[in-house]
Amino acid sequence: PIAITHANPAFWHPALRNKSGDVLKALGESGGMLGFSLYPHHLKDKSDCTVGSFCDMVARTADLMGVDHIGLGSDLCQDQPNSVVEWMRVGRWTKGIDYGEGSASDAGFPPMPPWFGGNLDFGNITDGLKAHGFDDADVEKVMGGNWLRFFKESFGPLN
């Protein structure tokens, strides 16, 4: 199965990396996984995105794909200098710079939303999912359980 490791639905925010409802529906139907990106350029309202908006998007995507096919794919580059993003943007064959959702005038890392400044803030997402009606079992799936199952089923022994 296919994994889209860090993107969001285009119905929520039309970033270049984000995927259409048709792609996400097919991904879920085929047993694939979507990892929700927390990179500000992929978020509705970017650095001003709220945890409520993010968790509402997760709930809408669960309705579209099924809760067993979604998880977090944070795309977190915590405490990295701008030289890291500069290195990532250089084309390996073209040697041209691809700014993706950024621009030449604003080429560095955008600030993270206040509710997710780093890996110590995953609990804010857990709390947000519960506030949006996810039960404990589904929160556990979204927060990592689905990825563990997907990896086990997709990369386990062949015999």
Show which residues each predicted segment covers:
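A conserved active-site cap/scaffold subdomain adjacent to cofactor or substrate pockets
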Residues: 28-48
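Conserved, mostly hydrophobic/aromatic
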Residues: 34, 75, 139
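Histidine/acidic residue-rich metal-binding segments in metalloenzymes
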Residues: 1-3, 16-32, 52-68
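Active-site glycine- and acidic-residue-rich loops that bind
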Residues: 8-18, 42-56
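Mid-to-C-terminal alpha-helical segments outside catalytic/metal-binding sites
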Residues: 107-159
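Short acidic/histidine-rich active-site segments
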Residues: 38, 65-115
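Flexible loop/turn segments at secondary-structure boundaries
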Residues: 10-12, 41-45, 78-81, 148-151
